[in-house]
Amino acid sequence: MTFAARAYDPRTGRVIDCLTTEPGVQVYTSNGMNGSVVGSSGTTYRQTEAFTLETQHFPESPNKPNFPSTELKPVQEFHSTTIFRFATDASLPPLPR
C-alpha cells in the first residue's frame, strides 16, 4: 500500500488521504458542471464543488513498455486495494516523504 494523494480544505480542516496498491491516480474535477445536474436530494452540482480520486493503472500502459503492465491472462485474477482515510487537520498524520 502506497500513499498516493492528500486533499485538504483549509477552510474546514477536512482531509482525505488516498492509499492504494495501484500505480496511478487520476484526478477529475467538476469544472464542467454548470448547475444543470440535480442530485436525488435536490442539490445542484456546480463548477469546482466536487472532485474524485480514481486509482488505476496509467491510461497509456498498453502502449508504454516502461509502464506497469495491464495485461491480464484468462486464468489470472486482478486484485487492487484502495483506502480513503478521512480526518481533520488536528488529527493529521504527517505526509510520507
Describe the role of every protein-language-model region:
Residues 1-97:
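Active-site pocket scaffolds in enzymes
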